[in-house]
């Protein structure tokens, strides 16, 4: 029977060796290790052979039993360590696992155990991770608001530029035929193309003036738009709320009136030069008629462009007012929404870190007084406390009083108390009361209940 058992043991041992011939490390040969432990084959003298069978690749000489007792614990430590600095292999073991007083089987058992979950080396990440995530969500919220704010300003300036680009009013030229007829009546020879030349001067001066107004406004608004595109939110908000933004927008049309006046004077001068080229000397009546007609045309020219630029400036001012109102509404609404959003984020973090909250209250009061030859006094105290938490709640109170009067003295006292508690693991209540009174020689009584 013993021979049969030995034979079966050898067969099982050979099967284990054949099935476990490919090993990456001891953690891949739990079956073989359990076999060694079960059959008491893990003596210290066989430790190197066992590690070789496990595929550890350890090439150390087999020492005798006496030398194995003096071996250090470094023989049992894994050869490869994790290189991730943030984590430490919780399955690794120190020298206490493999000292001289321990058996090698416990060391191999530790090595061949299933891999454990890495433990964070720095627990600060329990705080850093939720805080970083919360910060990113808050950043996205505020960044979205800042983008909306800036886009509104940029869109406003872009639309203003489009309006300015389309500023090209066509001045209706005056009717010069009555003036030419009047000059001919006064004996002045007038070329047939005189009226056309005067109308051409009107159109040319109108085009030039519109271009000048347009170029000046484009430069002011374009420069402002370029600055806004490079501004951060705080600078842009300061520019808008301070009123500088509105003043810069309106300055695009602030110098148009002098330009219009100068253009009207130039038109008058150019048209007068046309009549001065006529042959001969003009009679004074003809000069007066020409001057009056050209002066009226100049006034009409100035009035026309003043009206056109005023209309454009009014449109821009209305759009500017709408922009300021929209930005104010956006800021107020987003501020309220952000307060709610931030409170919810902080509340979630508070619940994560602190969990359930507790509250407690307590109070005591007392008083004493005395009177009489020997004295009489009374005193009392009362107190109560209560608490609640995730694991239980309790309350208790006590009150007592004593008084005495008389030459010899008489007194009475009493105390009562109660406590109760309830929690997830149990509940209980109890109370006691007692009192005593004496007069003359003395008296005593008491009672308790629970």
From Swiss-Prot:
GO terms for biological process: sporulation resulting in formation of a cellular spore. It is found in: Spore, Perispore. Sequence repeats lie at residues 358-374, 375-391, 392-408, 409-425, 426-442. Coiled coil: none annotated. Residues 1-18 form the signal peptide. Residues 358-442 are annotated as: 5 X 17 AA tandem repeats of G-S-G-S-G-G-S-S-G-G-S-S-G-S-G-S-D. This is Spore wall protein 1. It comes from Encephalitozoon cuniculi (strain GB-M1). The lineage of its organism: Eukaryota, Fungi, Fungi incertae sedis, Microsporidia, Unikaryonidae.
